[in-house]
Amino acid sequence: MAKTIIVSNRLPVKLNIENNQLSLQVSEGGLATGLGSIYKQDGNIWIGWPGIELEQQDQKIAAQALLAEENLVPVFLSEQEIQKYYEGFSNEVLWPVFHYMPTYALFEKEYWAYYKSVNEKFRDAILGLIEPGDTIWIHDYQLLLLPQLIRDVTPDATIAFFQHIPFPSFEIFRLIPWRSEIIAGMLGADLIGFHTYDDVR
């Protein structure tokens, strides 16, 4: 049966570890609340970072098993990846530019390199799970490159992307040195959604 694969930077739960024991804590974020019922239906799954760095392989295996009980698939990221891809490119480049505050942006090449490599990590996780007829539903600015990365490998995939923050005018967007790659990444989706008509324009 065809399934929906939801993909976001974070899973709708946070993985905790205490006394070498793993547990799950439900997220209170809007995305987790809004899509909470969807990923638990009909074999659907949710792919994302579990909110914690796990270095030991046995911990990763245990985490995968625990998350699988909730139809969740982790993408494990190192502290360095979180700092450069998420805190760096996502929050110090895309966030300020997309909110019309480009003077706060830090256009670091290293941030961009990590942003690309982490998007590729997410692609690899998806490719291990996608089957004919599945729909891939990607969420938000942390994964702008992902639609085309998937399309390059699986041309017939059904891909949707939704942007949960504003999308700037061209006059602002063109300030990003990697704007062409970002737009190309987004256009790998069959359907792109925005919050407002102004964002579409």
Task: Go through each PLM region and give its residues.
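N-terminal low-complexity, Ser/Thr- and acidic-residue-enriched intrinsically disordered segments
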Residues: 1-81, 159, 176, 198-201
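Conserved nucleotide-sugar donor-binding subdomain of glycosyltransferases
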Residues: 81-135
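Short, well-ordered alpha-helix to beta-strand connector turns
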Residues: 41-42, 133, 189
